[in-house]
Amino acid sequence: MEPLHIINVYPETISDGFGVRYAIYLAGCTHHCRGCHNPGSWSPVAGEPLTELILSRIVAEINDNPILDGITISGGDPFYNPFALLALLRRLKEETHKNVWCYTGYTYESLLKDETRRPCLDYIDTLVDGPVSYTHLRAH
């Protein structure tokens, strides 16, 4: 299994879902959405490999922080490497018991039809899905 690569972690953020969240940004994306806020994440080898040591540190940081409401997985596209994502999600849910948000360029419907990606949905509480689109945004 190809290892996940982490671009960045934000131990406390209010920008990646409701409440205070621990955000993990993963590398790898094939969508290449126009207006992407993180094009440096498209390469699957950007950042650093997610080692057991790094993952253990992340789990400990999450469990040691009483103000966290949950975990957010973003990127890139977390579903770029679905088998490694599944292992990560399973470990985070089992060891932290936090709710998990995941941002992806895939639609929910396409993930349901994809046998390699669908199992990840069992460990995601909130899915923010679909490609980035700025056609419906207006400044007020």
Predicted regions and their residues:
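Conserved Radical SAM active-site core
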Residues: 2-7, 20, 38-102, 106-120
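N-terminal pre-triad scaffold of radical SAM enzymes
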Residues: 5-32
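Short glycine- and Lys/Arg-enriched binding-loop motifs that mark or flank ligand-binding interfaces
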Residues: 13-15, 71-72, 126
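Short, flexible active-site-adjacent loop segments at beta-strand->alpha-helix junctions, enriched
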Residues: 30, 77, 106, 132-133
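Short, cysteine/histidine-rich loop/knuckle motifs that typically chelate Zn2+
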Residues: 35
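Structural recognition of alpha->loop->beta junctions
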Residues: 114-134
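Conserved small/polar residues in nucleotide/adenosyl-binding loops
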Residues: 135-140
